[in-house]
């Protein structure tokens, strides 16, 4: 069982929050997975110009305590700099990403815990700045 919460109804395939329950394989995640080509270009442009903003988000104590870092699944990372970007750009490791997500495995017991709402909310709150950054990128006109 799983559910997805979108953060912006006006954007197709907008960033959001994902809660997945599967025995011994539950997790919580957020961000945007495999955005469409034009959206990916907008996100990379935002990262290139506002790298410091993204760096602050992923270095934030709350984010790091819940998710450590953005997901870097090998299949979702380019081997080289994306077309049009300097391979020495300060944000090159972010620019190589094809998806901009963070996820964390969670114990199945959280779903029956009396504090379920509070525990899940703290994780979703930690993801909000990432989703805000991604929404800002997607709302930017070319």
Segments predicted by a language model, with ranges:
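Residues that cap or initiate secondary-structure elements
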Residues: 9, 25, 36, 108-110
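Short, surface-exposed, charge-dense and proline/glycine-enriched linear segments
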Residues: 1-9, 60-66, 86-99
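Short, structured patches in soluble enzyme cores that scaffold and shape functional sites
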Residues: 7, 32-34, 104-106
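Short, conserved beta-strand/beta-arch hydrophobic-aromatic motifs that form part
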Residues: 1-22, 26
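Long, solvent-exposed, polar/charged low-complexity segments
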Residues: 48, 69-142
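Compact, glycine/acidic-enriched structural inserts
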Residues: 21-80
